[in-house]
């Protein structure tokens, strides 16, 4: 008996039933918002821009389907100096306002780098607030010896800039003494107690790093990202420019990478360290500087790195984001290369 044909008919009927029993819903594509469109970085070479060409470019971008631009001023084109506009000057702010107005007309968003080139810095950053590095120098003394020596930075380039942060004395018996107060006018006058003493001087120096690829008007020192005062000074210049020229903040501000070379200190680090970690780093400078890895040296260096990470997150990333929010803007960060937990740093801004 052949049952295959009957079986086929049964499957066919069952299939028709399933198709007709399942309701068919019409699917419509959701409304496309500005956020769904791609955006582009917009290099302003030398900020040599004018209203006519800004409008032409923005209309071209809009026709291509772009939903926003990110303005990044950078160094200019050789031979075009006469058309360059200084960053944050009244004329530059007029160009930004024109861009905002045209973007609004075209349904696009205006974003900008909160600086020129990278990393953040410029003429508003004094040497006091520039990126900082530690220098350690050592001296020796025997018990009963009176030391009357100059405590100066050996590097001649730093001699007029660097300053003494701490001078600590460590004996072979385990004694630790802060003798910073014994230094007057860069000269130490101190008589060593019994024992053999190792003196470690900690100086704060500057890296002298300049903003890379800076646009006209943006040249200057890279700021101390660990210093709340330095970061406040930096964004205060932006706040003043936007306020005085009556230009609203853009949709977002961007940080075009960290890339701060050699900056491993900040003037308040020792006081911040004891407040956060519960002990004084200066009392453990021999262990901190010891190249041999032990449980103690590893823990101290870990605490040091954790302190730097917290200062970067709180004094730079969070302060920057709070500043942007006060002006109705949001932040976007390129945190890679930062001395901190990258996930924490990205989580501190609005757009990772």
What residues fall within each predicted segment?
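Bacterial N-terminal signal peptides
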Residues: 10-23
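Mature extracytoplasmic enzyme cores
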Residues: 28-32, 37, 46-49, 53-55, ...
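Glycine-enriched alpha-helix->loop->beta-strand junction motifs that scaffold or abut catalytic
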Residues: 65, 348-352
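Glycine-rich, proline-tolerant flexible connector loops at the mouths of alpha/beta enzymes
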Residues: 72-85
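N-terminal secretory signal peptides that target proteins for export/translocation
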Residues: 1-7
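Aromatic-lined carbohydrate-recognition surfaces of secreted/lumenal glycan-active proteins
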Residues: 110-121, 251-257, 304-341
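Short glycine-biased active-site loop of nucleotidyltransferases that positions the nucleotide triphosphate
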Residues: 31, 341-346
